[in-house]
Amino acid sequence: MAPVKSQESINQKLALVIKSGKYTLGYKSTVKSLRQGKSKLIIIAANTPVLRKSELEYYAMLSKTKVYYFQGGNNELGTAVGKLFRVGVVSILEAGDSDILTTLA
């Protein structure tokens, strides 16, 4: 597990992206944004199935997109983006006011 302070700062930066930037949630829309070359960073939850994770890594490698592995599960990632449901993967298209692209990648 990541230290609590760094995990909280990541959650804050992610919340700022949700408020001011553009993003997509979920596997299908993330793969679509990766194939179109629109994604700048993808965040994958820790409990994502191995096959799905490897497919996301493959598409990210093809589109030269950075990958960040979130320390919590999909419940925690859903809470971090302010949703009341589980989120396995988040694709950040535009960071907005956040410096998450330089910090995480």
From Swiss-Prot:
Keyword Ubl conjugation: yes
Gene3D superfamilies (UniProt xref): 3.30.1330.30
GO cellular component annotations of the record: cytoplasm; cytosol; cytosolic large ribosomal subunit
Record InterPro entries: Ribosomal_eL30-like, Ribosomal_eL30-like_sf, Ribosomal_eL30_CS, Ribosomal_eL8/eL30/eS12/Gad45
GO biological process, one term: rRNA processing
Other comments on record: Present with 59300 molecules/cell in log phase SD medium.
Chain's role: Component of the ribosome, a large ribonucleoprotein complex responsible for the synthesis of proteins in the cell. The small ribosomal subunit (SSU) binds messenger RNAs (mRNAs) and translates the encoded message by selecting cognate aminoacyl-transfer RNA (tRNA) molecules. The large subunit (LSU) contains the ribosomal catalytic site termed the peptidyl transferase center (PTC), which catalyzes the formation of peptide bonds, thereby polymerizing the amino acids delivered by tRNAs into a polypeptide chain.
Family to which this protein belongs: Belongs to the eukaryotic ribosomal protein eL30 family.
Subunit structure: Component of the large ribosomal subunit (LSU). Mature yeast ribosomes consist of a small (40S) and a large (60S) subunit. The 40S small subunit contains 1 molecule of ribosomal RNA (18S rRNA) and 33 different proteins (encoded by 57 genes). The large 60S subunit contains 3 rRNA molecules (25S, 5.8S and 5S rRNA) and 46 different proteins (encoded by 81 genes).
The name this protein goes by in its record: Large ribosomal subunit protein eL30
Name of encoding gene: RPL30
